[in-house]
Amino acid sequence: MSHVELQPGFDFQQAGKEVLAIERECLAELDQYINQNFTLACEKMFWCKGKVVVMGMGKSGHIGRKMAATFASTGTPSFFVHPGEAAHGDLGMVTPQDVVIAISNSGESSEITALIPVLKRLHVPLICITGCPESSMARAADVHLCVKVAKEACPLGLAPTSSTTATLVMGDALAVALLKARGFTAEDFALSHPGGALGRKLLLRVNDIMHTGDEIPHVKKTASLRDALLEVTRKNLGMTVICDDNMMIEGIFTDGDLRRVFDMGVDVRRLSIADVMTPGGIRVRPGILAVEALNLMQSRHITSVMVADGDHLLGVLHMHDLLRAGVV
């Protein structure tokens, strides 16, 4: 395209709003296609013992990739196969236990129609999403989902706009309907998103990130305050636990306790840790969610907490551990 000058006073906002108005109207019309065929499609996907395989060419392929990703992350195992690659070997990934969703606005994608006889021989259930109920794909489908739109938002009527939006929304409708039917929970969602913020909050537990073994700062009750301070410094967690030979907790000493000792004006060289420790101390169980430990630490205004099974010391958790894990 040759260089053109911007028309004086061209209103980008108005052009954008016109697109939204057209696509909003098309989506409102889509409601009529959430019908018995939609139920049949959902049932085939719900009872599928394999995976939902999504296919599409061009812009429909881009929508198909997103659709497969949404299915997979909401409890319906799914993947995308490019129809061109399917015709050259990738169709081997499809089994009779799968369900295929084929997308084409015209319903006449030659790359997809060429695959239909093979899918039929494999007895793979076929759901076609098209904008043309009389198309080849619609007639060949076990279930046809219509996404016909009155017009594209593109003023030339050429660039897929309203039609791709309608297809995307139909995919979301399938995914969410199945999600609800399966009783899919936030915890289930987190399992497929372990790297996301929600996944970390719903999956990461204290025992995944706590300090254990030699990393635990601890001294005996008979230790001097000086020895306890050396342990605090060596382990760099701002505290030390006071425990016996069996790692049974007797108390805790933190950098906050040290400041209070200095405020008392006593000779710290003559003190034992038993003189200044806090008996007992706050502790959490190793199996609780890291975010629960975070909430406790924030409510108690502490930066570290003991991890224990009853009085038996198992580890120590510091606020920095939660920061590194992305929980905060």
Swiss-Prot record:
GO biological process per UniProt: lipopolysaccharide biosynthetic process
Binding site for substrate: 75-76, 82, 88, 114-123, 148-150, 222, 275
UniProt-listed Gene3D superfamilies: CBS-domain, Glucose-6-phosphate isomerase like protein, domain 1
Protein's UniProt keywords contain Zinc: yes
GO molecular function, one term: carbohydrate derivative binding
Domain CBS: 210-268, 277-328
Top-level taxon of the source organism: Bacteria
Pfam family, one: SIS
Subunit-structure text: Homotetramer.
Protein name per UniProt: Arabinose 5-phosphate isomerase KdsD
Organism field: Escherichia coli O6:H1 (strain CFT073 / ATCC 700928 / UPEC)
